[in-house]
Amino acid sequence: MRINIDDDEYITASLPKIWDIAHGLSGFFHKSKEGVLALTNKNLIFVPRFLQLMSKEREKYFGDDKAKVTKLAHYSEADLDEDISKNSKSWICPLNSLVDAESVTIRKVNFLRITFKDKKNQLKKYDFAITRSVISYPQRQPLMYYSLDWTDWINLLKSHM
């Protein structure tokens, strides 16, 4: 039985090793986290979780410098629901609260920017990217990002809006 997502909800696309970056004042108090970005038929979900990927697997999700619309192998809706329950830093954004999905270039790097309204009807913005290098001490944080083409994800998100 699922607790966080509906029984008729299913994963449309998911990407591993994604870093989220919050904007505004909340971004000042929010450390970037690595996790899984999942799009279901009802929600956009980010779950902080470290996954180890081999280079062949990396090509499946980020080959040709494109964020591909695929599903994680061996990652089901039950796993997603369990990860949401385990990590309090997870967030769920209903697709009807999405305002915009766009690609933003900052310092020669393309980020996926999601704008949505939270429960208090305030606009929130998050950027998503994958990293080239990460510093692990004192806390795991990204240093440099890959510049990806997010067109497929943007089109998919806009089709769900």
PLM segments and residue spans:
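Broad, structure-driven detector of short, well-ordered beta-strand segments within folded domains
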Residues: 35-39
